[in-house]
Amino acid sequence: MASKIRWRLPEGVDELLPPKALQVEKLRRRLIDLYVSSGYQFIIPPLLELSETLGGEAHEELQEYAFTFKDELTGKNLSIRPDISEQASRIDAYRLDSNDTVKLCYVGDVVKRKVSKILRSRATIQAGAEIFGDSSIDADVESINLMIESLQSLGLEGLTLSLGHAGLVSIVLERFKGFGESKLRDLESALSRKSVSDINSLLSEEKDQSNRNLLISLCKLYGGEEVIDKARTDLKVLGSEAIECLDYLKELIKSLDLDKKVKLHLDLGEIQGFRYHNGVVFSAYIESAGYSLSKGGRYDGLRRLDNVPRPAVGFDLDLLAVVSFTQLDI
């Protein structure tokens, strides 16, 4: 019994053994080669960050997920990164300091204080690619196409691409900002789970049910392209800003040249893992997984360059999750 305790790993942490360790390494190399050949520069950000600078405009949210401790050398608080995409945005804004379009890619370990409810994992290997300084729809299209190509290159078949718009969700949730942070988080959680019963319970004491009905509408607005037209009716009270989000999704779909093997799914109530996205959001699934293998979206303004919000879009994937579903002979 004592010997088992000596080598037991922390909850939510695993180690890679043969042959899986080599399989993951081969997939990692394949991704780096794909990204570099596509015009992205490879970076290796540090595992540790100063807590006070972690996350930029999303500092508080990232800190919720980060393991933090005091540095005995300096006395400052340090955090283990829970996400690499925000590190890429820091490198773009403060190390590269370019007004031009910058494309960065990475593969590395991330550790989260909060355990994933799906994978029960707090430590994984995150791979991704980001585009900075380009606010065009072309950048969104490129990011989505590269995400799909990434998964296909890793031997995943039967992909479904899910599209949503964080701006649309934000417009609806803005109507509940007077409820306090805790209740707002509960509403976000209920929306992400599409739990109409929880939304009704959380808002049972509200006399004006119009806002509740909008939230419930978001829960139900998923499916094929027809969802966009239905949303124009169900969400028309939100005004022109919401219509612009829907128009953008319509234009984006037309611009995407999707492989016939990739199914398209709209989910207008989708909420990503981190809440710093503020434009189009996207994710990729396979039926056998039951959860997204890759997520991404637009997150303009996470960092600022010369006090000007820096446009950004990108995606990341969980390499340890992907290796379980690859069809490659590795």
Task: Report the location of each language-model feature.
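Beta-rich nucleic-acid/ligand-interaction surfaces
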Residues: 45-64, 164-174, 270-278
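Acidic, His- and aromatic-enriched active-site or binding-groove loops in soluble protein domains
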Residues: 65-73, 178-201
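Residue-level detector of short coil/turn "hinge" positions at structural boundaries
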Residues: 42, 158, 180-181, 260
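TRNA-binding/sensing appendages of the translation machinery
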Residues: 1-81, 86, 141
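Positively charged, Gly/Ser-enriched RNA/tRNA-binding surfaces
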Residues: 20-38, 49-50, 85-98, 104-157, ...
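General small-molecule cofactor/ligand-binding pocket signal
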Residues: 43, 162, 265-267
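Extended alpha-helical scaffolds
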Residues: 154-170, 179, 186
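General N-terminal leader/first-domain-start detector
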Residues: 1-12, 173-174, 182, 189-190
